[in-house]
Amino acid sequence: MKPRPPTMRIKKRYVLAAIVPNYPSIDSKVLYVAIAEAITGLYGDGAGAALHHAVVFAGDGYLIARCSRGSEQFLATALAVVTEVDGQRVAFRTLATSGTIHALRRRMRQPVERPEREDLEVDGVIYEVHVRESQKVDLIEKGCNSQKLLFLVEQDLQER
Amino acid sequence: MHCTDICTCSYPAGDSSLTRMTMEAGALGFDTIVLPVEQPAVIGNVSVLPARVIETRHVREVIRDLGRTKEGQVMIVMAGDASFIRGVVPLRGVHLLAGVERQRKNAFDHVSARLAAEKNVGVTIDLFPLLYLKGLQRQRVLQRYADLLTLHRRYEFPFVIGSFARSILDQRSVREMTLLCALFGMEKEEVIRGLTSLPGVLHQLLPVRVVE
């Protein structure tokens, strides 16, 4: 099949967002559904279809979503209202918008490797400890259906 | 530009510690955060202002609670019906009126708007329901905010925008707040004014009195 000439193609924009917390591995398809629901909830089916949105990358705590040019504000608003994906509480922090994926990839920082810490017991619940940059510590409840999250800093752990 | 965010609880009531919420607020473009804590603090470059939230149906109880206020506390009164709002807004020491979107449409009317403007009492725009409500309930909140915006443009009472976050996952950046406020027709300049208006509300200017 002959590809569509460049002038006939839809102009696209890409939006980079950080996924908070960054450890759950979320599938692109699940992310797409969550964003699609947010867009439909805010703007309806008609406007949602005009956005031509898609998730082109998800991993390392980042997400790159695509939309048609001129609708990146709508996509960023929809990303701001997503609070849960596949039963996990998350937040998307929009960082940048660009015309190319390459430009956004340059803005993605590699996650800093931290020495692993032992599991911690808080109020009778055992948490997995994830140490992040700037002394931030994320605690995630251990178990298959873990839901409980705690967001602390090193100082809070020392005070305990 | 000194942007202020309002949050409602930190660890152990919420899932994020005070330090973590303050750090997150700094990363999201705020330099002051209001939290129901006992003492003011500065963490990194972000100032923490202590707040007290009064939630009652009786004006008498609000007056009693205002008497127990510590200096430097931001007094936030949760809105009730029309008579409650009209009774509370003129009280000295009330800084912010929150939760107007939870009340009936006529609870905050043009009389309350004029009173709020005269007494320099801020009316809060809580972004939390926009994130967590869906469908008809979110539409109702958006309608209330659009109504408030109309009154604000007419009577010019202070607007204070806040995420009212209970966790770092509920906190939003200045840019995201601008986008969310655009949902009910707020302009970017109005959002910036709403994020920077708290110092003006806290330092209420009293009428000039001639002392002989």
From Swiss-Prot, chain A:
One of its GO terms (biological process) is tRNA 5'-leader removal. GO terms for molecular function: ribonuclease P activity. It catalyses: Endonucleolytic cleavage of RNA, removing 5'-extranucleotides from tRNA precursor. The keyword Kinase does not apply. Keywords: Cytoplasm, Endonuclease, Hydrolase, Nuclease, tRNA processing. GO terms for cellular component: cytoplasm; ribonuclease P complex. Its EC number is 3.1.26.5. Belongs to the eukaryotic/archaeal RNase P protein component 2 family. Consists of a catalytic RNA component and at least 4-5 protein subunits. This is Ribonuclease P protein component 2. It comes from Methanosphaerula palustris (strain ATCC BAA-1556 / DSM 19958 / E1-9c).
